[in-house]
């Protein structure tokens, strides 16, 4: 599809008015859509839309890069890839069979005890919206180069990561938004497991190679302590293979049809721990030039599945960080979503610009 005219935010309108509301039919296809936008200012935007069942954030950015490479030079070296088995068939052996089932059961018991102990807050819908009527909408935010450098520097100083800081800000904002004002918030954080598969999967190979694990954060603690706790917890979950346990759950217990899926979706709706999510793929090395094309940014965002209400999709490229918030309209009204995004960004900027405190002062 081609769109001509409009200002520099025409891409946002296309996403909110067309691309997010119009689902991709996985049974009949096509499985990929593109929109080429030529703005009044002479700039061009390329939207690449792929369903999450076959692509994650890294995959869709890779596809966009390949698309532009072919557009700039149709005679370019052809891209080839092997036909890979499903991700669950590439799991390390210790996460399959009886051992894999035992690992999943152990993690499930641990997480149930954690949730029972802390009663963490979730994103509670302002209005009930039936699954069939749900529509995702987008709020775009970003950090400029100076803010990104400051964030990276302060994260290192406090012994955490950029992802830890971004996720802490989102969890704290969600706590402010919650009527109960809980001391703990449950938030999902995806883990990319391409490198751990057998054999490993390259970033340019199409597929979904992430699994979202739940983390419970004590948001009553100082900001940088929350960020470190996220980093530590996520690192430990990766070491224990919790992301593969989730793949085991999906492979062994996922419903085979919509009728069978209803009870599972109802459970996730009522009690699922990851209806708030922070998905960060980090720095994506998108080129600044492809042939005669000069590129200014590359970013991704996500529509929301049946178990989510508010999601932050994050990556950096071309010296900036892109923070795309998506939410379920009406369940999270627009004004509420704007407040959440504003609080999230404000919390982060306050933390990275605050005077440096010693570790002793933080305790």
Segment roles from a protein language model:
Residues 28-47, 127-195, 320-324:
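Gly/Ser/Thr-rich phosphate-binding loops and adjoining beta-strand/alpha-helix segments
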Residues 1-3, 82-95, 100-105, 154-169, ...:
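Short, charge-rich amphipathic segments
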Residues 15-16, 46-50, 59-71, 147-155, ...:
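Structural preference for long, well-ordered alpha-helical segments in enzyme cores
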Residues 1-58, 62-65, 69-73, 139:
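Acyl-thioester-dependent condensation/acyltransferase catalytic cores
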Residues 8-32, 175-363:
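Acyl-thioester-dependent acyl-group transfer interface
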């Amino acid at each position: 599809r081609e769109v001509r005219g409009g200002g520099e935010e025409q891409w946002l309108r296309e996403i909110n008015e067309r691309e997010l509301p119009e689902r991709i039919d996985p049974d009949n296809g096509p499985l990929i859509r593109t929109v080429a936008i030529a703005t009044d200012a002479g700039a061009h935007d390329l939207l690449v839309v792929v369903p999450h069942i076959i692509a994650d954030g890294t995959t869709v950015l890779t596809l966009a890069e390949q698309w532009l490479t072919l557009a700039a030079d149709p005679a370019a070296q052809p891209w080839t890839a092997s036909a890979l088995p499903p991700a669950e068939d590439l799991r390390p052996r210790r996460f399959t069979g009886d051992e894999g089932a035992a690992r999943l059961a152990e993690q499930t018991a641990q997480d149930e005890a954690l949730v029972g102990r802390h009663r963490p807050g979730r994103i509670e819908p302002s209005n009930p919206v039936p699954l069939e009527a749900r529509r995702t909408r987008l709020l775009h935010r970003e950090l400029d180069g100076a803010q990104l450098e400051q964030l990276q520097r302060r994260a290192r100083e406090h012994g955490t990561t950029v992802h830890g800081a971004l996720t802490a800000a989102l969890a704290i904002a969600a706590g402010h938004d919650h009527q109960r004002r809980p001391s703990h918030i449950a938030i999902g954080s995806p883990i990319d497991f391409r490198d751990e598969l057998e054999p490993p999967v390259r970033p340019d190979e199409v597929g979904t190679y992430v699994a979202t694990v739940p983390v419970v954060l004590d948001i009553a603690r100082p900001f940088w302590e929350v960020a470190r706790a996220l980093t530590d917890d996520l690192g430990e979950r990766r070491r224990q293979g919790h992301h593969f346990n989730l793949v085991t759950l999906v492979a062994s217990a996922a419903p085979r049809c919509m009728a069978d899926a209803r009870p599972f979706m109802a459970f996730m709706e009522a009690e699922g721990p990851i209806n708030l999510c922070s998905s960060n793929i980090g720095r994506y090395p998108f080129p600044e030039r492809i042939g005669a094309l000069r590129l200014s940014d590359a970013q991704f965002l996500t529509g929301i599945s049946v178990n989510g209400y508010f999601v932050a999709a994050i990556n950096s490229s071309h010296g900036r960080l892109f923070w795309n918030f998506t939410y379920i309209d009406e369940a999270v009204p627009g004004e509420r979503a704007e407040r959440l995004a504003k609080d999230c960004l404000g919390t982060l900027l306050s933390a990275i610009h605050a005077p440096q405190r010693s570790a002793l002062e933080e305790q």
